[in-house]
Amino acid sequence: MTATFSTKPVLIPALALALSIGAAAPAGPAIAQSAVAEGERLAFDRGKGNCLTCHEIKGGDLPGTIGPALKDIKSRYPDRKDLVAILYDETKRNPQTVMPPFGRNRILTEQEINAIVDFLQTL
């Protein structure tokens, strides 16, 4: 005798579970866009990232001219680790720099530095 089993009762709850998990998971591009927006906010914030004090950034008001213009960043720094290191503590690479060590001095958190890098890589 051959036993026959119906898979329909199992498939419906399994499908519902899979759909609910997929619906609850945040979308990758939405998270990335959120980080870029937060990075832009920090870069333009005169009290936090304050990139505009020294750098020209597209869309920023009253930019400084001490540092280089922040454009074509992804082509200049294809490895984001390099840019993270610069923001964290540029004095390790260039002891004569006037760039503040944002990470070492705890001006910015690691998460904030990464958000700014996400933003800069869109320029």
Placement of each model-derived feature along the sequence:
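C-terminal capping alpha-helices of c-type cytochrome domains
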Residues: 81, 86, 92, 104-123
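N-terminal export/targeting leaders of redox proteins
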Residues: 1-33
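Positions in alpha-helical segments
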Residues: 37, 68, 97-101
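Electrostatic cytochrome c docking/interface patches
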Residues: 26-46
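N-terminal alpha-helical segment
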Residues: 35, 62-66, 95
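Extended, non-globular alpha-helical segments
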Residues: 1-12, 82-101
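Gly/Gly-Pro-rich "capping" loops immediately C-terminal to redox-active cysteine motifs
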Residues: 44, 52-88, 104
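Cys/His-enriched microdomains
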Residues: 49
